[in-house]
Amino acid sequence: MGLPGDGVEVRGELTLVRPAGEADVDLLVAWHADPEVARYWDDETFTPDEMRERLGRDGVDSFIVEAEGEPVGYLQAWRSGVAGGLDGFLIPGARGRGLMPDAARALAVFLLAGGWPEVTVDPYTWNDRAIRAWQKAGFVEHSRHPPDADHSAEWVLMRASLRTL
């Protein structure tokens, strides 16, 4: 079974998760420049060259989430040793329609079926919308943590396995 980052697309009931590529760079730069997206990503913004670098990182696969043939969001799957996790967002106009839980569940099931022992997410505790979306996708809260080198605020470790999905 190929990884989605190897060109494989993953379908949910409402969404298609496909690898992000060069053709998506300007779209991803624009999305990250939107204050309603950036605030959930520690206000990170990127130039096109910086985005290309991000898309080419080792250990991280980047994806575009599509609904009804239109790009509506971003997911990334990262792997470090036996640990692996997802991060993602939807553009503001796509929120509240169940698209992120659908896309995240589809990608998590694919990764778990491909050998990942579990998939984690780490939303900030203040991001109730994300926590609810991850719960709807099948992720279960495991623990809460203070800010650290990777998190600017208190965050929640949530886990999913084939048993919870």
Set out the residue ranges of the language-model regions.
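Alpha-helical elements of Rossmann-like donor-binding domains used by nucleotide-donor carbohydrate transfer enzymes
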Residues: 27, 50-53, 102, 106
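Conserved acetyl-CoA-binding loop of GNAT-fold acetyltransferases
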Residues: 135-145
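Acetyl-CoA-dependent GNAT
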Residues: 15, 19-23, 34, 38-95, ...
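Conserved hydrophobic beta-strand within the GNAT/NAT acetyltransferase core sheet
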Residues: 86-88, 119-123
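Conserved catalytic core of Hanks-type protein kinase domains
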Residues: 31
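Conserved acetyl-CoA-binding loop-helix of GNAT-fold acetyltransferases
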Residues: 96-113, 128-136
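Terminal substrate-recognition subdomain of acyl/acetyltransferases
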Residues: 2-6, 154-165
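Conserved beta-strand-loop-alpha-helix junction that forms the acyl-donor binding cleft
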Residues: 121-131, 147-152
